[in-house]
Amino acid sequence: MAVTISTNAFVNASLLDESRNSFWRPLFHQPYYNCRRVVRLNSRKLNSKVMFCLNLNTKEVGLQKPGDKGFEFKPSFDQYLQIMESVKTARKKKKFDRLKVEEDDGGGGNGDSVYEVKDMKIKSGELKDETFRKRYSRQEIVSDKRNERVFKRNGEIENHRVATDLKWSKSGESSVALKLSKSGESSVTVPEDESFRKRYSKQEYHRSSDTSRGIERGSRGDELDLVVEERRVQRIAKDARWSKSRESSVAVKWSNSGESSVTMPKDESFRRRYSKQEHHRSSDTSRGIARGSKGDELELVVEERRVQRIAKDVRWSKSDESLVPVSEDESFRRGNPKQEMVRYQRVSDTSRGIERGSKGDGLDLLAEERRIERLANERHEIRSSKLSGTRRIGAKRNDDDDDSLFAMETPAFRFSDESSDIVDKPATSRVEMEDRIEKLAKVLNGADINMPEWQFSKAIRSAKIRYTDYTVMRLIHFLGKLGNWRRVLQVIEWLQRQDRYKSNKIRIIYTTALNVLGKSRRPVEALNVFHAMLLQISSYPDMVAYRSIAVTLGQAGHIKELFYVIDTMRSPPKKKFKPTTLEKWDPRLEPDVVVYNAVLNACVQRKQWEGAFWVLQQLKQRGQKPSPVTYGLIMEVMLACEKYNLVHEFFRKMQKSSIPNALAYRVLVNTLWKEGKSDEAVHTVEDMESRGIVGSAALYYDLARCLCSAGRCNEGLNMVNFVNPVVLKLIENLIYKADLVHTIQFQLKKICRVANKPLVVTYTGLIQACVDSGNIKNAAYIFDQMKKVCSPNLVTCNIMLKAYLQGGLFEEARELFQKMSEDGNHIKNSSDFESRVLPDTYTFNTMLDTCAEQEKWDDFGYAYREMLRHGYHFNAKRHLRMVLEASRAGKEEVMEATWEHMRRSNRIPPSPLIKERFFRKLEKGDHISAISSLADLNGKIEETELRAFSTSAWSRVLSRFEQDSVLRLMDDVNRRLGSRSESSDSVLGNLLSSCKDYLKTRTHNL
């Protein structure tokens, strides 16, 4: 027999069989969106197959046979109200007591009150229904997998457990307080634990007594209550016997016709508590509890069995056992405390209950729903199925339990006032993802390049980025903008080691890396990436990748590698790939104009004019005509090779086939400049302007340099001053046309700031052109004009300093050097660097070389001291010779400044400087200072330098001095050494030996 039941998906669906066995398991653990799940089931106790259908769009649950056409499965309105009412009731109850004391307990109840067990769970289905509803309360989600494994027991074990649960009583309590009434009033009073009284008092105070509906039961419901009361009476009697052994002062009096009572000492707080409970009890229920004739018989049987149970409990209390033995596993009750909390509840707590049918179909519904769910989960191979994009939301894979994939509650069945923490967060927006990627790029850019691999992986994974082809490409792009090409290669290596990362368009990532490496001028690394692309069919280069690597190699001048790339384009893959669906896949390509232009760029760097004719031949074979850009590059190749006649020839060919561009005119102007034809260069630019071709700034810059090198500085400056005002005037006209008069000043200032740097570069180029041509005066004139327009930078000042010194204008050079040195004293913040220039190493070396060459030792000393003051160190290879010459010329302060500088920096002076200082001290008669300088360096000089302080070396030095001076020196050295044992190879030891040999030689000669 099969029953098809449709109900709200928030509860469960059921299939009922004749044995009425039930098995419970949560049905919906995780939200499915816009999907339909159909599972075929083979019932164990049914011959016919059933189909379990979950339509998650409409939240319908149904059971159909395979022969049915559609899933026409909708819950009835009464069933829907019934389930929703139970769910809302469960949500309001946050705490439940383990044991509910009857209405008359405590001494204040009515003797003829009608008792009824309201929420006793006879079947496993209804007992689990309470847990199921509590599980979907306000702050609880189904997560207890241990309960689910226990709930997989069959129906017989479930019924046996419920029966044993009815016999189980509170094992931790030291006393029982019960009040029974059979014909009159019979009471049993037992002292109970203080914690139990406080908890029970708090629960009784918060009980609700104004429920609007009663419980209507049919004849089958009365029979069910009979079984419940029989088992209750047995348990209470057993508890009473047990308490009898623990309390020696219990006096039990029984009366068959009148009043029978069992009296025990009672605590005062216990009486106050029951008095308070009776005060809050509700006795004005709006509707009674309708029962049939069998209900009256039930009350008689219940009361008789309750008295027997109490007597049994009193006898049982004689034993010393503190716990009540039960047949059920104690671990199950400890793991399921919420199920043991709800035992009994008064009829007076609710005026109106849940309407049930005569056959108790609510219990059967839940039991069969659990059983069907268990069968569905056992037969549905969820591991082999692949989750779709929408099903994957919120799924958490667990190899031990497939149910972990559905560990979240369906949001559609949550109440509006409940928390939505379980619902997946919305997808990250594109802007937010871009911000995360850029932040990660900055973190990686600032980190150490030699950071460990685990630390790099941690930084990558902690960015909260879902790594796809697009996100990795953007990460490489941001790293390229920051100029960190090493980190780009590290990111690619990290991706190659990730087994979980499956890229569909890895070619795009490699191509982006090629672009970054090309902009960073890293041709070798780009070629390595290109070789890596050839190893996989998914990353095999396309035309975009070939263009990128060709441009990179062409700018670097690697012609051989560039021809290798061209051969790779035209040939099939050398590696044999696995056969794919692309049977006719052919990666062979022909070079296009971009690749050929890259070859011309390489020829410019290598100055190989033969490559230009090879490009023309290849274009002719393909039937293509050279573009203006190609002609311009060919002319540039001929200019680099100094074949000026070919430049003019190709320019004439370009005029016949197409209109020359600004690049071609620039190459032509540079050619005329090299030939010394400045007038023709001017006419060429005028012809370009007459044709309506807009020249670039580089063109006018080259023309201005041509004029300045020819001595026509005014015309060159006019050319420079002509370009910028024209641009500013055009921008100003555009602003007026756009009716944005109020933004004119702001835009003009912005344009001036943008044009500031190119203007400095332009003037610097003009000065360099004049210096190269030998026109120092013109260079000085342009330098003075430049100060009126913009502030010269360090490069401009160094060029002019060298020009002054080469042109014999030493005074002008000294003034410029002094101005640059004094600017360092007036810098207080970063904005001062824009208008002031500080000298660098090139500035000091240029000034020192010129002063030493012209033997201007005073200026040399000033420049040398300024160099040390600005933080630049003494360079022995460059400065030692000049320092020794200055010392011999009488500028000993230069040598002393060098000695002090090296002492502060813990550096050992070179041996020529040590000897020179020693000689100067001996000449002045300061033997103590001379010996002290050697003693301080004794033991610190390297072995390679000790050769300069050998005995023979000192002998050559001492030959310059008189005998009396050497004798005095020997005495001072002996006093310095004293009793200390100096090795024969030490500096002072060698000096002493040399002095003795020198004196012996002089004495022998005399």
From Swiss-Prot:
Name this protein carries in UniProt: Pentatricopeptide repeat-containing protein At1g30610, chloroplastic
GO MF annotation list: mRNA binding
One matching Pfam family: PPR_3
Biased composition (Basic and acidic residues): 194-219, 265-284
Keyword Repeat: yes
Transit peptide endpoints, chain numbering: 1-40
Biased composition (Polar residues): 254-263
One GO process term, biological-process aspect: chloroplast organization
Keyword line: Chloroplast, Plastid, Repeat, Transit peptide
Organism: Arabidopsis thaliana
Compartments (UniProt record): Plastid, Chloroplast
